[in-house]
């Protein structure tokens, strides 16, 4: 997705050799037009898979996931990082470690909104070590839902997330693949690395 690749190159800020800040269009301020295009691209890639639900995790996964759900015309469900007082009945839960925040959170999804009749597309903002996507996949498995793929907005290809997801048998689609953040510069896969 060329517009996303260009945005990452122009507006992405390298924090260190493993962390890329994209607060200007994805993780804090959201470029709605770009996210609409992201959602449409995921729709084009997975439209024949019978998706009934988009699954993501709060907070940064919500923007691309909600845009995809508009194109699929299905609900967007996000895993919560805290159990709300309104959730009285059953829920699925799993522990997810955030690479960027270096923090482990227990995330939950109400059993009311995910079950064996669902066909799920998982969408997330970043792929680093794969923990968030694998955690969401675990929740889908607990619900006995079918997972048809993982849609990633920005993949850090120099980390092992894709490999871990593919080893789990998951179909991974990344719209922008970062090859390196060395030298305080964003190098995308396919560029002069």
Swiss-Prot record:
Signal sequence bounds: none
Pathway connected to this protein: Purine metabolism; XMP biosynthesis via salvage pathway; XMP from xanthine: step 1/1
A molecular function GO annotation: xanthine phosphoribosyltransferase activity
Stored InterPro entries: PRibTrfase_dom (IPR000836), PRTase-like (IPR029057), Pur/Pyrimidine_PRTase (IPR050118), Xanthine_PRibTrfase (IPR010079)
GO biological process: purine ribonucleoside salvage; xanthine metabolic process; XMP salvage
Binding positions (5-phospho-alpha-D-ribose 1-diphosphate): 128-132
Main location: cytoplasm
Disulfide bonds: none
Reaction(s) catalysed (UniProt annotation): XMP + diphosphate = xanthine + 5-phospho-alpha-D-ribose 1-diphosphate
Top EC class, one word: transferase
Domain of life: Bacteria
One Gene Ontology cellular component annotation held by this UniProt entry: cytoplasm
Subcellular localization, as worded in the UniProt entry: Cytoplasm
Residues noted as binding xanthine in the record, renumbered to the chain: 20, 27, 156
Keywords: Cytoplasm, Glycosyltransferase, Purine salvage, Transferase
EC number: 2.4.2.22
NCBIfam families: PRK09219.1, XPRTase
Its job: Converts the preformed base xanthine, a product of nucleic acid breakdown, to xanthosine 5'-monophosphate (XMP), so it can be reused for RNA or DNA synthesis.
Family as reported in the entry's similarity comment: Belongs to the purine/pyrimidine phosphoribosyltransferase family. Xpt subfamily.
Subunit structure as annotated in this protein's UniProt entry: Homodimer.
Identification of the protein by name: Xanthine phosphoribosyltransferase
Species assigned in the record: Staphylococcus haemolyticus (strain JCSC1435)
């Amino acid at each position: 997705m060329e517009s996303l690749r260009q945005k990452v190159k122009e507006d992405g800020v390298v924090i260190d050799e493993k962390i890329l800040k994209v607060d200007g269009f994805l993780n804090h301020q959201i470029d709605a037009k770009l996210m609409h295009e992201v959602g449409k691209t995921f729709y084009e890639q997975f439209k024949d898979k019978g998706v009934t639900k988009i699954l993501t995790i709060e907070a940064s996964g919500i923007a691309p996931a909600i845009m995809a759900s508009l194109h699929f015309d299905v609900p967007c469900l996000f895993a919560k990082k805290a159990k709300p007082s309104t959730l009285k009945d059953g829920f699925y839960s799993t522990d997810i470690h955030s690479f960027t925040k270096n923090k482990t959170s227990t995330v939950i999804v109400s059993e009311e909104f995910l079950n064996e009749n669902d066909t799920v597309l998982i969408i997330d903002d970043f792929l680093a070590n794969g923990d968030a996507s694998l955690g969401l996949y675990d929740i889908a498995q607990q619900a006995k839902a079918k997972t048809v793929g993982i849609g990633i907005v920005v993949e850090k290809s120099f980390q092992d997330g894709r490999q871990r997801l593919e080893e789990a048998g998951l179909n991974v689609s990344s719209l922008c693949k970062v090859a390196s953040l060395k030298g305080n510069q964003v190098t995308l896969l396919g560029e002069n690395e």
